[in-house]
Every structure is written in C-alpha cells, then in structure tokens.
Amino acid sequence: MTTPLVEMDGDEMTRILWKMIKDELLLPFIDLNTEYYDLGLNYRNETDDQVTIDAAEATKKYGVAVKCATITPNHARMDEYDLKKMYKSPNGTIRAILDGTVFRAPIVVKGIEPCVRNWKKPITLARHAYGDIYKNTEMYIDRPGKVELVYTSEDGEEKRSLVQEFKAPGVAMGMHNMSASIESFARSCFNYALDTKQDVWFGAKDTISKTYDAKFKEVFQTIFDTEFKDKFEEAGLTYFYSLIDDIVARVMKAEGGFIWACKNYDGDVMSDMVSSAFGSLAMMTSVLVSPQGYYEYEAAHGTVQRHYYRHLEGKETSTNSVATIFAWTGALRKRGELDGSQELSDFADKLEKATLSTIESGKMTKDLALITSIENPTVLNSRDFILAIREALEKML
C-alpha cells in the first residue's frame, strides 16, 4: 500500500471484531498501511469529539476511510461512560464535513434468500442526508388561530402563505432543503452509478408537492441532462424518475441491480425495508460518497451492545462480522483502484469470496443459521467464524 487508509476504530462488540479482522484476515496477508483514529466513545469524550473532526479531515486528505460502528450517546450512555456532554452522532459529523451521500447495499449470498422472490441482485439505496423533517421546526397548536409560512428577505421584504386556520388544537411543522444539497446528492448518485455500473431510479411526490418535491425532480433532471446523459449512454446506463409510490411498486417487481435514490425520510424507511427483506442488517454494506470523490466505508449496523455485554461476562458470542469485513474490502479495493494497485484490489475480491464461500459451505454465525435455506448449518462463535474465513482465504492465495 502506497497511500494510507484512514482507519476509524469504534465501540463495543464491533471494536472486538475489528481487531480480530485485522489480526486474522488482513495483517498476515497484506502490508496494511493506515492512519489510525480512535472513535471509541471514551476517546471522543477525552478529546471533546475533536478526534471525529480530525478523522473526517484526514479522509479529505487521503480520499478513502474505513470506519467501525460507534455509539451515538443517549442519557443512559452519558451515565455509563461518565461523559462530559451528549456528543453528536460521529456519522452525522463526518457526513456534514464530507458533504456525502450514504449508499447501502445488501451482501447477497447463496443460502440466504430474499423475502421478495424475484430479487436476484442487490438494490443499492441512496439516502439524501440533509434537511426535510430531520431539520424541522414543530409546534403544538393548543387554541384557535392561524399558522403561516413567512419568508423575510435580507432587505426586509416579506412573503406570507397561510398553512392552516386552526379552529381546534393540532400540530404544525416547517421544514426546508437547500438547492446546493440536492445538487450534491444528485451528483453523488450519478457518479456512484457510473462507478458501480448501475442504473439510477428516483422517486418523489411532485404531483402533490408542486414546489418542494418538484424541486428535487427538476434538479435531478437538469444535472442528469447537462452533466451525465452522455456518460450514461456511453456506459449503457439509464436514469428513471417516477412518483415515489410507483417506484415502490416497481422495486417489488424488479430483480434488483440498480441504485434507488431516496429523499431523506423515504431513505430512512426504505433502507430498513430493503435490508430486512434481503435477510439482515448484518449483511448490509454502507459507503459515504462525497461529490469531491472521498469515500468512507462501514457496516450498516450498530455496535452490537447485547453481545458486547455477554463478551464482558466471559460468555461466548456468535456475532456476524460480514458487513465489517466488507467495509474493509470496500475501502481496500477503492484504495487499490486509486493507487493503481491491482494486487490490493484482487486481495479485497478474494477476501469477499472467502467470506461468502464460508457461509455457502454451511459455516455461519447464529443469526444467519436462523434464516438460511442450507440444511444443518454449522453455527460458529465470533472468532471461529473469522478463522473459518481465514482458512478459505489461505486456500485462494
């Protein structure tokens, strides 16, 4: 490796798996070169979360990062870890600095069949990560009156629109988005489509939301027509827009193999539907892609808290490490591509094949054994599963 990967360590059971993966599947086989940042909650607390900002800035410098799952603290975690304050989600902080779009895709393996019979290829879900209800202002209306949307320009000019004349109690909400953020989202989707050779589908509700959702539709179409149409034609790819309800119906009948671009809330909901229908969150990859060409790979799941507490009690765990392994392989493959190191990209491919062939041979963790169509699977503990993958990898190298 000529350029280092930015390595972001994490929390709880995934931190344990992180070390096992490095020790058993990476360090014995490649000259691993990383710039290490400890995003474990204790060190984030020690540095007042500066380490998260430093890790994101390092990603801008080197271009590719791999991240372990991390705790986003709530009140219980504040007490448990004796935190100075309620720190923000590290993913949110990194996403804001890199201005990225999150792409999630299921890891498809024989023996773990999707609930939707006709899904044969992964569906990559792209979620716009800015604005809408996640940056809203809400109000409870407790007596009769009117709610208005008011815009005041810098020179004092006002525009007013009546939202609702309330005769009785109710609720109201104001939300927004930024044209620049929608443009950035569209570019990320189209660039990633070219990168991964997939079509793009996008849905909104512009028939009802004739300004808000219509803006999303218009931005996507304009950017596609002016910047990507020729490149897509050359690559044999298509961009398809329809109403969100029509897109959902089409997704259920499709065989997969495309990028489904979603507005923030749609993406929040549909990513869980897609991951659950494909089998498991522990079998979902996640990559943050910025329009400037920075990549940050991680597993789509959390820190597996329940297994970590079992581990601390000295009890055996059977924790699925597949998505975390694929975070490493995704980052190594991208680093190999950018540095022109075919050897590194080939190693990433082989490690993925070794992981999938281990499951297909009937050796797997407990969560997969519960949903597999393979008869009499062998349930392995966390370490033994990684060692079984190492055995398969050694045969390939």
Predicted ranges, named:
Residues M13, L17-W18, D23-D48, A56-T59:
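N-terminal alpha-helical transmembrane segments of multi-pass membrane transport
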Residues I30-Y36, T196-A204, F228-Y241, G336-A348, ...:
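Flexible, glycine/charged-enriched surface loops at secondary-structure junctions
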Residues L41-A55, K217-F258:
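N-terminal small/polar loop signature for handling phosphorylated ligands or for N-terminal nucleophile
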Residues A129-G131, K135-A186, A193, L338-S341, ...:
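Glycine-rich phosphate/pyrophosphate-binding loop and the adjoining helix
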Residues M1-M20, L149-S242:
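Glycine-rich phosphate/diphosphate-binding loop of Rossmann-like nucleotide-binding domains
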Residues N42-E158, Y265-V269:
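N-terminal glycine-rich phosphate/adenylate-binding segment common to multiple enzyme folds
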Residues V251-K350, A354-S361:
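Glycine-rich phosphate/nucleotide-binding loop
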